[in-house]
A protein has these predicted regions:
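Feature marking well-ordered beta-strand scaffolds used for ligand recognition
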Residues: 2-4
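Short, well-structured hydrophobic secondary-structure segments
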Residues: 6-54
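Aromatic (tryptophan-biased) beta-strands that constitute blades/sheets of beta-rich domains
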Residues: 9-16, 57-61, 100-107
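Repeated scaffold domains used in trafficking and secretory/extracellular systems
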Residues: 15-29, 63-76, 109-130, 145-149
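Short beta-strand elements that form the blades of beta-propeller/WD-repeat-like
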Residues: 28-40, 72-87, 127-136
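Structural motif
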Residues: 39-47, 89-98
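Charged low-complexity stretches with an acidic bias
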Residues: 42-71, 75
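C-terminal charged interaction modules
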Residues: 82-85, 91, 102-141
């Protein structure tokens, strides 16, 4: 478990994972990317926290016996990020929707959620097709410190 603390507030949040890899402040909260810290069989956890630091949605990107290294992380304003994980030549995007969507059944492998059937999601995870260009990309720091709690 990873415990993060907002720099300006006393609020703390516990997340699955061990390493806070990237953090972005977006219009309606924060987007956090957390890994286990093991590149040989890695999982990427993507969290959307609202401005009061409540976890509104989370998703796991992982595949059994498959290495994963997070790279090429960039922000596409206002509420989207692009990154590489399993292979540097392929890209993924994670967008925070303006309002949650209801879904029946889960996402396609290797995207995993805690709720396998009917659920409400704020995060939309997609594999980006080749040839799609990044436009207006820049990094926005978010105010979190983290520590591992044993």
């Amino acid at each position: 478990m990873l415990t993060i603390k907002h720099c300006d507030r006393a609020d703390m949040v516990e997340l699955i994972g061990g390493v806070l890899e990237a953090q972005f402040e977006i219009d309606n909260g924060y987007l956090l990317l957390v890994t286990e810290g093991n590149p040989h069989e890695e999982a990427l956890y993507i969290y959307f926290l609202d401005s009061s630091l409540e976890i509104k949605d989370s998703v796991e990107l992982s595949a059994d016996y498959t290495p994963g290294i997070l790279s090429n992380v960039s922000m596409i304003p206002p509420n989207k990020i692009r990154f590489s994980f399993f292979d540097k030549s392929e890209s993924w995007s994670a967008a925070v929707l303006h309002r949650p969507k209801f879904h029946f059944l889960g996402n396609k492998y290797p995207v995993k959620r805690k709720h396998p059937f009917l659920y409400k999601s704020w995060l939309e995870i997609k594999k980006v097709l080749n040839g799609t260009q990044n436009v207006g990309i820049h990094r926005i720091p978010a105010p979190f410190k983290c520590g591992i709690r044993f």
